[in-house]
Amino acid sequence: VSGLLYQKLGGPSVFPPQPKSMGEGIYGGGGWRTSSGTDRYRRSLYTYKKRSMPFALHDTFDGPSHETCVAKRETSNTPLQALTLLNDPFFNEAAQKLGQWAVEQKKEEAQTVKVLFKKCLSRPPDQQEQMALRGFYQKQFNRFKAGELGAEKIAGKGGGEVNQRAAWTALARVILNTDEFI
């Protein structure tokens, strides 16, 4: 949805960002060498796998164990998943990219909310959702503008007015954290 996924086929395993503690104390040594550039955004098929050092995101989001064939993945919705979506660098980068995209739309706020929502969830928001999202955007924008929150930290690098970009990033984080998106 954010446009970060790198579509290259084939190649060596990649190491997306994950907590440093995941590589500590494993049998056989070795750590997690976080990939850089576009390799950070490869499909999970290319993620390095080692039984003694699982990729945390796979475990958090019900990834199969790789020990047996699985015809249908289990699905769940847990607080740990919500916390991961709000705090993991991978998802924050995706939200920042969507926030930058929203700023570049140069449309009215209501229209941008509608387009961002549809881009993420493949359906337009109903009237109640539209009002709630616009209210959230306005509240966050005002908080960033007043200096209550660090706009630069939330928005990341990019063009356009930083408070606006940060507010769109915050809204993108909300949409990406919905059960419907997961």
Task: Identify what each model region corresponds to.
Residues 1-115, 158-182:
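An acidic, gly/pro-interrupted, aromatic-rich
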